[in-house]
């Protein structure tokens, strides 16, 4: 890692020297960043879309680990720590990476406009895997693993869509990095808020 760090210190382009600005100038620019963000065409519809895109994930993913490890008598699947780590951690991560890579090829071939609806469906519908696991409570690790790996693959496949949507529809402009950061923050909020409520819903 140290060798890579030294290599990048020498090979990466140097940033141009920054001109020091007063606090008042910096504040005015920050205000302009916010104003220009909300002046973008269709921005409010875009923000609603971004917020809803990962809403299902927020409701499912915070409570899913507890569900998978909880006792069958309490409605869970009763996975051991070893099986949980193997299925949810190792196999799920590999499936996520493969899904992301294939999604990149899919979008580059057909374009984001033609693929966005299918990406929304691919991202959200597989969360029904957890509903099916809760209903049938299978004990067979192959069935459990197949369902979770499928969900993670679909998650990786669909996640690329929302990332590219923010980059192509919201970020372009004078303050593209700041505007992308705003959109990304809202997207993460759509996961955090439902995640806080998911425990209450699960025990209601």
Predicted regions and their residues:
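C-terminal membrane-cytosol helix-exit motif in multi-pass small-molecule transporters
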Residues: 2-17
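Juxtamembrane intracellular "pre-TM" segments in multi-pass secondary transporters
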Residues: 15-47
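Pair of pore-lining "gating" transmembrane helices in MFS-fold secondary transporters
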Residues: 39-60, 149
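Short amphipathic helix-loop junctions that connect adjacent transmembrane helices
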Residues: 53, 62-85
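Loop-to-transmembrane helix entry/capping segments in MFS-fold secondary transporters
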Residues: 81-82, 173-183
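Helix-to-loop junctions at the C-terminal end of transmembrane segments
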Residues: 98-117, 202-203
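C-terminal ends and interior cores of transmembrane alpha-helices
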Residues: 121-139
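Intracellular juxtamembrane helix-capping segments at the cytosolic ends
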Residues: 157-172
């Amino acid at each position: 890692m140290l060798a890579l760090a030294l290599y990048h210190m020498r090979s990466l382009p140097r940033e141009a020297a920054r001109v020091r600005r007063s606090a008042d100038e910096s504040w005015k620019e920050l205000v302009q960043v916010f104003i220009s963000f909300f002046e973008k065409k269709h921005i409010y519809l875009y923000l609603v879309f971004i917020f809803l895109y990962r809403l299902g994930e927020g409701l499912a993913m915070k409570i899913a680990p507890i569900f998978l490890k909880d006792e069958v008598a309490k409605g869970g699947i009763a996975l051991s720590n070893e099986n949980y780590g193997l299925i949810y951690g190792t196999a799920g991560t590999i499936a996520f990476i493969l899904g992301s890579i294939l999604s990149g090829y899919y979008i580059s071939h057909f374009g984001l406009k033609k693929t966005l609806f299918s990406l929304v469906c691919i991202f959200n519908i597989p969360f029904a895997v957890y509903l099916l696991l809760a209903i049938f409570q299978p004990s067979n690790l192959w069935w459990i693993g197949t369902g979770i790996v499928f969900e993670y693959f679909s998650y990786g496949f669909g996640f690329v869509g929302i990332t590219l949507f923010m980059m192509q529809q919201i970020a372009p402009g004078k303050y593209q990095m700041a505007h992308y950061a705003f959109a990304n923050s809202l997207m993460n909020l759509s996961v955090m808020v439902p995640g806080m409520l998911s425990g209450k819903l699960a025990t209601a």
